[in-house]
């Protein structure tokens, strides 16, 4: 068989094995041939380090005797590759050979195994004897400890109270003949049996809970035979195993923006981030983070996101947050609004008609309408001799502001412009006409009912002039009795109108109270001319500095007839046992006064700041007017009965709500 055959060329391993095998068999000296020295020199120069296979091929080509060995060797190798399968092990040729070899070496193997067993038995006996010695010492120690504990128990038993012995007859009657112990040996035997039963029961219960202990391995051969192969998944080539072939970090802008958004939400939870980023897994997200962390400041992005969340939360309204509840004052306004919306069209028309009549009967100093005729209103005004100076002062202030508003209205229509000529009235963009029965015997509850029924809106038209005197007030000029306009505007402004009414009343009371110069004389005289008892209480308290003192309540009148009016002395006002006059007003309305006065002042100042240069002369005068009389232009003034009745109604509603809750 030649080496150039395709069968040999397909098996290069055969040539290598054959070279190793034949080099050991063939002689080291090469046979004499027809090779020239020149050829050998040229061969060595071309291949300076020939391999064994090349040497072997040269030798086989020159020697004809080695061809037979080559053919035989190759035949043996190919014969081994053809595996023959047998059902029984005895059918294989190597089985009989191994059996003969075992029979020949059997005695030697048995002697070695017998010697190992003998050594192992001696070791076991030595360990058992040692264990018995240790066990005996341990049992002696346990017995000694038990005796000491029994001695301690007997000492403690003697110190305790003596045990009361019972009669032996009853005890013996419970025993039967079979329970009687005849001797001490039987007694000890019974005790031993009981102890044995207890031990067996305890051993059975413990054996069910304790794991089985395997036998000890005493010989080295057993250790080797029970060797556990822990080379499962063994890493032989560490650099190749732990090498991470990084793929190019190719991310488009959309993927990067999604990655940044998810990183702000989830942080370094790259598993969740990879779910949102299309076409990327968690490993790629981790790699992208560490490659871009120098160029993109992820920590700053997370910090800015948390800051913006906090700011947005602070800017939310209380109604949006849902944390702050409405005050009781606003709840009252909602109730009044619901009652007003349910009014019928007929009642609304009646209110407009009543408003046209009462608009001519407004009082000049408190700007509140009256149901009485013009003569009775003039008489009440003439009775205020002590307040004429304050009336003139208010008139001058309003006249100055009205002149400025008229000039402003000529340039652009302004619904808040004012004109005052000869005790004229303040005309607001949203004027509230309140129908109140201001009589000497008037009570707060009746007044509140009239407030709820007669509150409406007066809207001046744009085509009409803004300078309107008291003599030219007409319903068709000032009011547009359209039901659609009235109902739509009423829903939006009903609550603010009630607050404005109460706030303007407080403002006027404060101005009138501070204008009284001789409080002592009025108090000693018994009452103020033209004022009822509740009005006097409010005026006295306001004159002392905006309700710093306790004031008495309005006395009840008997059913038989009116009781004489009490005199309000300064000693009674200073009494701490009296209620404040502001309790009838409720603190919520006093807060409304402060809020409305500040808003009106700031709004007025803002309007003045953007005016033209020609109106700058009026700015200082208007600002001083606002400080002196805060709500003279913002809202119309209501009567004191309106204020007191509203306060009493608030107290009643609060008590009813508390009972319901």
UniProtKB/Swiss-Prot annotation:
Q: Which GO terms describe its molecular function?
A: DNA binding
> What are its GO cellular component terms?
nucleus; Rpd3L-Expanded complex; Set3 complex
Q: Where are the transmembrane segments?
A: none
Residue ranges annotated as compositionally biased, kind Basic and acidic residues, are 478-487, 604-617
> Would you say which domain of life the source belongs to?
Eukaryota
State the Gene Ontology BP annotations.
negative regulation of DNA-templated transcription; negative regulation of gene expression, epigenetic
> What residue spans carry the Basic residues bias annotation?
308-328
Keyword annotations for this protein?
A: Nucleus
Mind telling me which SUPFAM superfamilies this protein's record contains?
Answer: Homeodomain-like
Q: Where is this region: Disordered?
A: 25-52, 306-329, 478-499, 548-570, 604-633
Q: Which InterPro entries match?
A: Homeodomain-like_sf, N-CoR_corepressor, SANT/Myb, SANT_dom
Q: Where is the composition biased (Polar residues)?
A: 42-52
One Pfam family of this chain: Myb_DNA-binding
Write down what this protein is called. Answer: Uncharacterized protein C22E12.19
